[in-house]
UniProtKB/Swiss-Prot annotation:
It is found in: Cell inner membrane. Its main location: membrane. Its EC number is 7.1.2.2. The gene is atpD1. This is ATP synthase subunit beta 1. It is an enzyme of class 7 (translocase). One of its GO terms (cellular component) is plasma membrane. PANTHER family: ATP SYNTHASE, ATP SYNTHASE SUBUNIT BETA, MITOCHONDRIAL. GO terms for molecular function: ATP binding; ATP hydrolysis activity; proton-transporting ATP synthase activity, rotational mechanism; proton-transporting ATPase activity, rotational mechanism. Keywords: ATP synthesis, ATP-binding, Cell inner membrane, Cell membrane, CF(1), Hydrogen ion transport, Ion transport, Membrane, Nucleotide-binding, Translocase, Transport.
Amino acid sequence: MGKTEPEQTGIVTSIRGSVVDMRFDELLPSIYSVVKTGREMEVTVEILMQLDRRHVRGIALTPTEGLCRGMKARNTGSPLKAPVGKGTLSRMFDVFGNAIDRRGPVTNVTWRSVHGAPPQLSRRSTKSEVFETGIKIIDLLVPLERGGKAGLFGGAGVGKTVLLTEMIHNMVSKESGVSIFCGIGERCREGEELYRDMSEAGVLDNMVMVFGQMNEPPGSRFRVGLTALTMAEYFRDDLHQEVLLLIDNIFRFIQAGSEISGMIGQMPSRLGYQPTIGTELSALEERIANTGTGAITSIQAVYVPADDFTDPAAVHTFSHLSASLVLSRKRAGEGFYPAVDPLSSGSKMAGESIVGRRHYDLAREVRRVLAQYAELKDIIAMLGLEQLSAEDRRLVGRARRLERFFTQPFFTTEQFSGLAGKSVPIANTIDGCERILRDEFENYPERALYMIGSIAEAQEKTVIETTMSESVAAKPEGGN
């Protein structure tokens, strides 16, 4: 629980956007204390700085319209708190823990400070275990870690949110734990659609949703991640459950911190980011960990400005992750969904000691084939496929079939694609890739491997297409 102080009253002395300065003649509010101000005490301010013996500076978590100098400010004496407990399941919250799903107030909860400490090293688990997603290209080439952190890196419109929601669907439907979705600075529409989709899928009972949308002040977007994390820690530490924490988008968290930094007068660092970017990100990321009794597995979408992976936001986020999934605009443009770039993505879980010799050797061979194909593309574009050696032509065929086999119809896009979603066990993925590399599908059309689940579907697809072609060819001339 956060430390509580006696309530004190002060006055507002300055307002600059979301930054509010206040004067307290008696006891100064401590850092992270919540102060209420406004005509009806409707504006919530979190204290970030003590300027001198009588003045403090804070960031408003709500809009400051109507706030004037000289208005009273009341120190609540406590930090920002979040509701924790089983009563939060199936509900949707804002940064303050208020329910925003129009289903009435939340019951059966207690309130905890959002400013917690990471688990001690002695409490952390060192066991490495793969977290299966049911998505072929991820499970084979970029396996995720149970209790680890994975990032989905990509620019605008390459499928980060779709991939994130597909993982929610696959994991919630087969895992016994709790999923918490945290929307930081994203579109209101996406949150509403996710809530409706999860409700229709029947998995909402084991989910909690927390949103700080893009139209909200930077203070709200900056703290909503801590609200969601506090809820996740309750399920991990108190109920000893497995928790899946999905964050969309961690870049918006950094962006909100940058806005706040500029408004409170800190000197900007490279590309205008706040000088404290590393500290702020670590305060969030280090609390995401697995202990001996429970685990928080986190998957985070990371927007990459202008597809520049040297951007400080992307660089600082990379250092906290056990797996990095890079989404390629080129692959998305070619229709390969999910648009995961197999050569740029990586995971520390892909080692032989973790996934086993068969999986490890296959993943290396798949990467080798795809890498050689990437090198040959320029030659093919200039001289044509016929100018390659017979061995290189066979390698190109394998690579093209692998690329198509790694595409997959998603449950969350059924209404758009018209294709039934597929979740594929890792054993089926390994079997399919091995058979492709053995050239068992050399005589199959490449389209037979596109947007399927297991490899057996390619055979069924080809049989159906062949039967239809034969029936059309056998149709008598002039027949109906």
